[in-house]
């Protein structure tokens, strides 16, 4: 079977279920294997959590291993983890949606409870009984048991989760990677503009550690953003002394006394830009550089090259230098100068006096090395380790006074214990690479060396070495996917369970305890349920169409727990970054306040095991582009020269040009082609799935491309799907990768096909052996999350041979395996009577008549039957006070029949609710006695269809509580479900039976078996039953053995089919678990047909959106010369200012595609002996230079006619992103189609028949109908709810609100002097409570009196003024009827 790109080979045939290969202008070669599974990001992440990963342990396993064993506080017993087991889901995905339950699997863990023999127990220690043989603790008893710890929501095959019957998606989150980050305030903190540097160590779990300079260049640290302390406190808390700190941060320079001064080693780097106050002399006393001369780095290097290794410093030249270690009087041991102190003139005298011959100085020159750590240390240089620990404790836990051991334990737990602090492997790798460390990856806590190196690097930044980190660089941001989120929640649940187990251990009698007594399965279930139900990243799946599903699963959000908030996110984090290239789409993002915070994964990008996004590139070796594809991280990419995919290469894949533009280090540079390391795999690798579906994307303004990407996700699946004539070649890929189509699991032959099932007999590659039966149950008229219709249709026929991953059934918005969100319509860009003012759209009535944009929407209505204190509610047909005509569409039970046409206020389910008995008046009792009328002691509580819905009932589900008697309708539904199970079972048995009996006949024939009474085997086979066949030829031992083996295999498969069937029936008969007090739930599904009408929103793929203003009769629409009316008129003024020229180019190419199809049709209709030759010749011209040209040449005449007939409606084109056809190529196609190469034609006015003055751009454009339907928005209210405070009607359709009569509307009435209307609007129609009651009374009485009182909003204003201590009183003056405010 061919894909949308076609397949070559001798005798090429286009199958009926294949899409016609597109005429593509792509030059680059796609790596299609990366596109087969677009939702791999979800699946891989979940599999890593639940399955076996690279280390041989899953995420679940590692959590259990970290938690167990659990010991009781006195060490008498221990609860050990042995293993875990994940069960099978109780119901399949379809059944969970239907029942409204969670699709989950039970998790059971095997625990071992060990109790030790003890001699004596005290709070200080436990004395154990020791086994004499092994010299180990003696076990009193050991109990092992498998325990359930709850259910884990399972990911479906579509990458979603079904929670309470609703499909949800866990969106991946972009967050700052664990590790260390260096930053500066960019001079914004202080008015002087001085840069203040800071560093932050971010763990995956645990306390944040910040380091920062202040304006005086003192270094401070903070823990969890609490009060800052000097960094010396932290270093001393780590056990470092003053000398240790100085040794760690400063190099030492040894000064040796000689006759003329101090002899010092000559270090080149110390003389960069230095101006000495004394002459620079060598050890011999020769002056090399005069005093006060600026020494540059070049001079210093020259002096070193000339052999200068030591120089002389005068005795007074050491003034102001910092001593590296204490200088001690050799005779008395008294300290002359303490470590870190500066040398003064007094000190110089003492040094000479005590004959100090050698001094170690700190290498601080105030230019390349500053005294920042030293100054910080001298803030409190006498502080001890204990003082530092207590000071840190006081900041974090103020108000407590603990002992030293508690303080040490607390400090150790902050950063150095894995239970409370976890950098994660990612954090450790980032820390190692940033700081040049070589710490083992499994060390996920901080070390002393880490902290010292962070401070060192911060000091180097202040000294002018290195650069700060870019937090928006994708090397510093990682993706947290679904598996990681669930793992974190799982860990939280297990930790809560651990605490409960430890509490229980302290109070339980061990002799009677079993492992199950310690575990409460609700703990984990509650945590997981909260996450899936209420987390910001667990979202109701966008299921409008297949594209919206795929996009939602590939979405990346910077919001959510541990992420940003939209209010605090600045411009930088939202902006496109150079590292987004090939990783995050620069186009697709929301338009509102979430812009830039929510983005989409680029089409070829994938996420590695550490959560960083990788992009693929083709390796270049010696100017030759190889087929080797390598995935690079953002951090790696900057080191290489990467050329664009559009770089010209010859037939040997060698670069044609000597110089190429490349990306390197975030910039574009021109380099020699020999230096190029990689080349992009495809021009479209920078965009997302949605953006890759926009033809001529490169001709559109980015803002409009963004709208186009977003609006494709809002397109409603139409009644009949139609693939675009002008696509991008990605339509097939997106459809196959979305899960909306049904793909064949294995090679095989279609054995049976109908509207609901496809049965395929699967074979091995050589078609020799049957591997089994694949039964595909199609989704028929199911309701999506957004009320659109999901309906799968088979595209294969009986007997078709299909290969693995072939499309065998289309879904909604799919046409022969290609994504089909809209329709190809004939468009004219012109104005028409002002009806296309401001992007309005004019539509032909013919489009409505042909149901071109008609869509089916499925509404779900639910009726709940409860048990009330007065008795149970009942579903019944005889509803009080309802005439028989209104009940005609209900069955005997009282539930609407499938197929019934229902409209506003139709009863869907008849239901009555008991009410308290009422005492009847005497006259009613008399009537009851005389006529025997039944008095209802119940009220009508039936399910009525809402006023804005009209449609056909397509399905009814009845759920009856287990133990409650089922009604006839639920029994009928159950019987139909069992029938479908029987059908599935029989399909499987039929296929297997047919295969095995064929194999049996072949075996008997090959063995030459003779059957008594038959001349040959064929006549025997024609008459023999299946049972007779199995007993034939058993006299031959070899044949009998083979037959026995075959029979065992056959019986095994048939037995398995029967077992599955019985399992399904048992589950169905088990009944339903309904909420407390609910007896029955009835769900009614109504299919509503939405025709196109004024007010509906439509759009193209280029951000060209508009609302239908008028549906014009087809005869009045402008028409072509042959009388064909245009389908749609767009305003030509909507193109220049929006700069989305792609729609015009699409129109031209669509015009060429249709006219080429018409020309092919004319050749076919003409017939004649030369037809095949003419056809081949014309198709050769169309597909000139295409791979498909050779396929067409290899076609037989019959195959060619089939292919040509499929092209009658138009030749499908592909204009891939950034590789669309140029003007000349479009003009060439227009000329080939024998139409004006300008793409414009003369149109005729349908009303007058006159030709328009000038030519008009006409062609075919792909238009989408969006989910903003006027039927869902139109709303009216007469009486409804009012606001509690203002007493004004609520607003909006969802609240059944009124229309706001605002300030400007009041001005309009004032302008016309409509005083009474204005008064009415502001009082009785709004918030005059007394007035509206009086109006109601006067209407009932038939009066025309009109009285209005004080509006409630006035009272609210008075109350607000009183709250400001302004007493406003309304006084009634005797002389005046109006009130005055005092």
UniProtKB/Swiss-Prot annotation:
<protein>
    <recommendedName>
        <fullName>DNA-directed RNA polymerase subunit beta</fullName>
        <ecNumber>2.7.7.6</ecNumber>
    </recommendedName>
</protein>
<dbReference type="Pfam" id="PF04565">
    <property type="entry name" value="RNA_pol_Rpb2_3"/>
</dbReference>
<dbReference type="InterPro" id="IPR015712">
    <property type="entry name" value="DNA-dir_RNA_pol_su2"/>
</dbReference>
<dbReference type="InterPro" id="IPR007641">
    <property type="entry name" value="RNA_pol_Rpb2_7"/>
</dbReference>
<dbReference type="InterPro" id="IPR019462">
    <property type="entry name" value="DNA-dir_RNA_pol_bsu_external_1"/>
</dbReference>
<dbReference type="InterPro" id="IPR014724">
    <property type="entry name" value="RNA_pol_RPB2_OB-fold"/>
</dbReference>
<keyword id="KW-0804">Transcription</keyword>
<dbReference type="GO" id="GO:0003899">
    <property type="term" value="F:DNA-directed RNA polymerase activity"/>
</dbReference>
<dbReference type="Pfam" id="PF00562">
    <property type="entry name" value="RNA_pol_Rpb2_6"/>
</dbReference>
<comment type="subunit">
    <text>The RNAP catalytic core consists of 2 alpha, 1 beta, 1 beta' and 1 omega subunit. When a sigma factor is associated with the core the holoenzyme is formed, which can initiate transcription.</text>
</comment>
<dbReference type="Pfam" id="PF04561">
    <property type="entry name" value="RNA_pol_Rpb2_2"/>
</dbReference>
<dbReference type="InterPro" id="IPR010243">
    <property type="entry name" value="RNA_pol_bsu_bac"/>
</dbReference>
<keyword id="KW-0808">Transferase</keyword>
<dbReference type="GO" id="GO:0003677">
    <property type="term" value="F:DNA binding"/>
</dbReference>
<dbReference type="InterPro" id="IPR007644">
    <property type="entry name" value="RNA_pol_bsu_protrusion"/>
</dbReference>
<dbReference type="InterPro" id="IPR007120">
    <property type="entry name" value="DNA-dir_RNAP_su2_dom"/>
</dbReference>
<dbReference type="GO" id="GO:0000428">
    <property type="term" value="C:DNA-directed RNA polymerase complex"/>
</dbReference>
<dbReference type="InterPro" id="IPR037033">
    <property type="entry name" value="DNA-dir_RNAP_su2_hyb_sf"/>
</dbReference>
<dbReference type="InterPro" id="IPR042107">
    <property type="entry name" value="DNA-dir_RNA_pol_bsu_ext_1_sf"/>
</dbReference>
<dbReference type="InterPro" id="IPR007121">
    <property type="entry name" value="RNA_pol_bsu_CS"/>
</dbReference>
<dbReference type="Pfam" id="PF04563">
    <property type="entry name" value="RNA_pol_Rpb2_1"/>
</dbReference>
<comment type="function">
    <text>DNA-dependent RNA polymerase catalyzes the transcription of DNA into RNA using the four ribonucleoside triphosphates as substrates.</text>
</comment>
<dbReference type="Pfam" id="PF10385">
    <property type="entry name" value="RNA_pol_Rpb2_45"/>
</dbReference>
<keyword id="KW-0240">DNA-directed RNA polymerase</keyword>
<dbReference type="GO" id="GO:0006351">
    <property type="term" value="P:DNA-templated transcription"/>
</dbReference>
<dbReference type="InterPro" id="IPR007642">
    <property type="entry name" value="RNA_pol_Rpb2_2"/>
</dbReference>
<dbReference type="Pfam" id="PF04560">
    <property type="entry name" value="RNA_pol_Rpb2_7"/>
</dbReference>
<comment type="similarity">
    <text>Belongs to the RNA polymerase beta chain family.</text>
</comment>
<dbReference type="GO" id="GO:0032549">
    <property type="term" value="F:ribonucleoside binding"/>
</dbReference>
<dbReference type="InterPro" id="IPR007645">
    <property type="entry name" value="RNA_pol_Rpb2_3"/>
</dbReference>
<dbReference type="InterPro" id="IPR037034">
    <property type="entry name" value="RNA_pol_Rpb2_2_sf"/>
</dbReference>
<keyword id="KW-0548">Nucleotidyltransferase</keyword>
